[in-house]
């Protein structure tokens, strides 16, 4: 059975795709078959610049259709059918992999805090723990802790679990303080420039 991790962010400024690249590269040191799956896409025509980037980094030879779940529109119109389609496609894709990096949606089509909730619901249904990526470039250490705690509550309310928190794009002037603050959380943490 494939191992997996679900990357999600609290907003688009977190730039989780950079974290995904680093995670994929690290996983390739330990696993032969590392794959990337996108459960929610903005467009039905298959254009997704994040997936296009990340599939060049993984080790799975598979068409993009195998790596995709469904669209925001499908979730809006038929949420149960959309979730089932994501589950079916994920189950088929993970058979090709030793480990799957699931890269959540990009805060483009779901209003407010609903996007993290959607990602948490998907992660819970996939049985995949979540790695939360925070925007370290514009939040103070105290704000990052508050954001991490709120994200964790939101995720756990949807019956998913958090295995770690990453503050991405932290200024070098605050990175030590961010690391110290995040270190108080009960999950693995990292702060990266």
Task: Give a label for each model feature.
Residues 2-96, 111-112, 141:
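N-terminal phosphate/diphosphate-binding loop that engages ATP/GTP or pyrophosphate donors
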Residues 105-189:
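Conserved catalytic-core segment of NTP-binding enzymes
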Residues 1-18, 122-123, 133, 153-158:
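Extended hydrophobic/aromatic-rich secondary-structure runs
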Residues 8, 166, 193:
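Residues in well-ordered beta-strands of folded domains
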Residues 33, 96-102, 129:
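Loop/turn-to-beta-strand initiation segments
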């Amino acid at each position: 059975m494939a191992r997996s991790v679900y990357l999600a962010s609290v907003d688009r400024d977190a730039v989780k795709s950079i974290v995904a690249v680093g995670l994929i590269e690290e996983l390739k040191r330990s696993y032969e078959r590392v794959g990337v799956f996108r459960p929610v896409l903005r467009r039905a025509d298959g254009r997704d610049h994040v997936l296009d980037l990340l599939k060049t980094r993984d080790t799975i030879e598979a068409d993009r259709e195998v790596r995709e779940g469904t669209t925001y529109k499908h979730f809006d119109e038929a949420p149960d059918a959309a979730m089932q389609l994501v589950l079916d496609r994920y189950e088929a894709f993970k058979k090709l992999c030793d480990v799957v990096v699931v890269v959540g949606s990009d805060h483009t089509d779901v209003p407010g805090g609903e996007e993290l909730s959607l990602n948490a619901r998907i992660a819970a249904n996939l049985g995949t723990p979540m790695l939360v990526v925070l925007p370290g470039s514009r939040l103070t250490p105290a704000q990052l802790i508050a954001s991490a705690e709120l994200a964790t509550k939101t995720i756990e309310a949807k019956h998913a679990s958090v295995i770690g928190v990453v503050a991405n794009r932290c200024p070098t002037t605050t990175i030590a303080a961010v690391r110290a603050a995040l270190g108080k959380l009960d999950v693995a943490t990292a702060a990266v420039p």
